[in-house]
Each structure stands twice: as structure tokens, then as C-alpha cells.
């Protein structure tokens, strides 16, 4: 890939008046502001530190983490859970199982604890957090019980979702101890089951789910940061998808790059050890635009980035992500 150099790009910043806003605000105003901020895409500072390997990773269950890989997740933002308790996960499993069966069998009485054809399992995801202060992530699964009496078969997983918080200190500072901050919810499975799960959580913990779209701006950040990750091996090309609005239907442009070429390009623009800056992201993307224009005479900057895919993960602007490989140490 041809090298290119863009100087003098201004860094885009999004300043926050969160601290000033909360001075004198009522508890209700604080919660409303928290909801608004969670629903406005991912925060986009002008620079981000590259997380180092944490001692928390020693607690991670490799089997559970492997289960989360290679699945497409639809992401939602989530307001804090009121009166949620990790010690009650077994009770939540029984209550949610009964709720799902009752919703699927409208008009039929259902007793909690009854033997259903489905079951729900709540379990913690130890180590899936950024700091000790972050609340523990947890996994929710809907399973279909095997109906075969002749042979023992594993229950079939119908739906999976997990709740997590990574480096969420700023969120926890705005709520009381009665609330558990797990601002990110990821779901894999039928939308009907996702809807049931959301309904139950909203009724039980007085929370609110919102679909979380990923802007083209944040997709650029993801592309740069994932390209920067050190990998044991590269299994997939780095791909970008741009959407060109036109009539009568839109046109998509796909751009595939060898992962080692993408890595070399990133290393040529990355000058700040331990962090990624907005200027570096802009340089990285503008080099791609320049290279593409040189060969195809198309200005990608005039289109809209809708998907990025790397050896680490992929993400789409409609709020769908997939994690492919673990980062090497």
C-alpha cells in the first residue's frame, strides 16, 4: 500500500460538562441525564488509553469467554438496575423461566418452580471488567430441555445475552448504592426472546433498554484500535464497507486490505505510545481514502462508513458486533 502523510489535521474533541451539570441537580435529573448520555452512541474522546493486561484476567473462565466468541451480538444501552443482587441469580432464573412460559402461553396459569420445557440460567462472567470497581458481568441463557428419555443430550441453547461494564467509574459516581451499573447489554438469538428478556428486566429492576447504533465516527476508532491490537496470528482480511446514497437504491463499496498491510499503515501513523489519538485515527482513515482514490477515482470521504471487520472483531452501524479472537499478551 502506498504511504501517505497528512499534516495539520485538527483534533476533534467532544467536551463534557457532566461535572458542572450535576452540581445542584436533583436525583431524577441525574438519572435522566445519564439515560440521555447512554443513548447518544459511544463516548468519543479525542484520545483513548490502550488498556494493559489486567490481573482481573486471571479470574476469567476460558470456556465462557470462548462461548462469547464468533457470535453476532446486537448491542443495547441499559440504565442502572435497581435492587439487583448477584446472590439472587438462582431465584432470577426461576422467575424469568416462569415469565417466559407464561408469555408464550397467554391465558394459561403458570406456577414458579414448575417443570417447563425451557429453562433460564443466570451465571457470572468473572473478570469481564476493566477495574475492580466495575460491577461483575453476568450471562443469561434460555435453553430448551431435551425431550429424549432414551439418551442423555445436552440442552439446546436458544438465546444468549450478557450484561457488562468496563471502566464505568463515571457512571457509578452518579447513582446510589441501590443501583448496579451494567450499561451494555448484548443479545444473540431470536428478537422475540430478546423482547421478553427486556420486558422482564424492565419490570423487575426499573431499567430501560435502548438500541445502540454505532456511528461512522466510532467505527473509524474501532478499525484503528483493532488494527493496533497485537495478534498471535491474523486469520482474516481487514475490510471496510461504505454506503453510497443514491436512487433508486443505495450502493455499497467494499474495501479489503491484507491485515499485515493495515498493521504497517497504522504503525506508520501511530506516534503516541500507550494511547490512540483522534489525529492518528484521522490519518489512518485518510491514508485509506487517498489510496482508494488513487486507484479508483472515488472519494470515500463523501460516503458513509457502515461496517468494519478485522481479525479481532467486526462491527456494523446498526449496532451489531462480533468478536473473533483474543488479544495476545
Swiss-Prot record:
Keywords: Centromere, Chromosome, Nucleus, Phosphoprotein. Component of the CENPA-CAD complex, composed of CENPI, CENPK, CENPL, CENPO, CENPP, CENPQ, CENPR and CENPS. The CENPA-CAD complex interacts with the CENPA-NAC complex, at least composed of CENPA, CENPC, CENPH, CENPM, CENPN, CENPT and CENPU. The keyword Nucleus applies. Belongs to the CENP-L/IML3 family. This is Centromere protein L. Component of the CENPA-CAD (nucleosome distal) complex, a complex recruited to centromeres which is involved in assembly of kinetochore proteins, mitotic progression and chromosome segregation. May be involved in incorporation of newly synthesized CENPA into centromeres via its interaction with the CENPA-NAC complex. GO terms for cellular component: inner kinetochore; nucleus. One of its GO terms (biological process) is chromosome segregation. The modification Phosphoserine is found at residues 40, 54. InterPro entries: CENP-L. Its main location: nucleus. The keyword Transport does not apply. It comes from the Eukaryota.
